[in-house]
Curated annotation (Swiss-Prot):
The gene is MIOX5. Its EC number is 1.13.99.1. GO terms for molecular function: inositol oxygenase activity; iron ion binding. Its cofactor is Fe cation. SUPFAM superfamilies: HD-domain/PDEase-like. It comes from Arabidopsis thaliana (Mouse-ear cress). This is Inositol oxygenase 5. Expressed in flowers and siliques. It catalyses: myo-inositol + O2 = D-glucuronate + H2O + H(+). It is found in: Cytoplasm. GO terms for biological process: inositol catabolic process; L-ascorbic acid biosynthetic process.
Amino acid sequence: MNISVENPVFVHEDSTTQKTGELRLDSDIPMSKISSDDEVFLAPEMNAFGRQFRDYTDTNSERQKSVEHFYATQHTNQTLDFVQKMRSEYGKLDKMVMNIWECCELSKEVVDESDPDLDEPQIQHLLQSAEAIRKDYPNEDWLHLTALIHDLGKVLTLPQFGGLPQWAVVGDTFPVGCAFDESNVHHKYFMENPDFNNPKYNTKAGIYSEGCGLENVLMSWGHDDYMYLVAKENGSTLPSPGLFIIRYHSFYPLHKAGAYTHLMNEEDKENLKWLHVFNKYDLYSKSKVHVNVEKVKPYYMSLIKKYFPENLRW
C-alpha cells in the first residue's frame, strides 16, 4: 500500500507562548489544518503535578529524585554492547503473538517511572495523544494510529516480555557508539558508562560517518526501538514519517535540542518535521482526564486493520 503524506504548512515560531495557550517551539513547525480556535488542542502550561513539563531541576520532589535515579542507572548501563545484545534478543520477535489492540490493553499495566509529568497507565496517554492529534489533523489517520501505538513497546517491562528494568525500556533515548551529547538529561551520569572513555566511541561521529542516516545509527535500547522493529518486521504499511516518529519520539536531544543532526540524511530531515508536530501532542496532552476507551475503540480498530496485519509477532 502506498500512502501519500502531504507536507504540512510551515511557519516560524519563537519560544514565547501564543494567546491560544499553545507553547511555541524554537523551530519551524507545521500548522494544523483546523481554523476554528475552539476545536484545536491547546497545550497546558503545567503538568498533572502543577509543574512545568519536563522539569528535571526540582530536587525537593520525591518523584524528581526517582527520575534522576532512573537516569543515573540508564546512562551507566546503556552501552553499545548492551544495545546490540538487546536488538539481537528482541529482534527475534518470539515473545508473543497478538494484535495491536490486545497490546493496548496490556499497556494498562505499565507506568513509566521516568516520566516527570504523569503517573497514569499508558493506555490513557496513548489515547490522549491520539485524540488530541485527531482534533487538529483529522485527515492524517496514519498520524492518529502512530500516536496510539508509539509507546506500546513499554510492555517490555511486563513478565511476558522478560520483565526488563525500567532503565532498559523508558526514558529519553540517544545514540550509542559515539559521544554522549551534553544536551542529554542528567548528562553527568554518562561518566560512569564504560563507553564514555572509549576512544572508538567518544568522538562526535564515533563509529558512524556524518550524514549516514539515523536508520544506520544504534539508539539506546528501549520501547521506541522495539516498537519500531515490531512494526517494520510485521509489514506495517505506515508511511515513513510514522515509523520515524515511533523510533525517535523519545530522542529529545535531537528534536528538542538539535543535537546529533550531523548523523541525519535528507529523509531524516523531512521526517523530523512530522516528529516536531507529534511531540506537542505526546508531551502536552498528558492529563488526569481519561478518554472513554470503548467510545473511541471502533475508530482505532479500523485504523489498525488498515495499516497492520491481524496478528503480529512481538
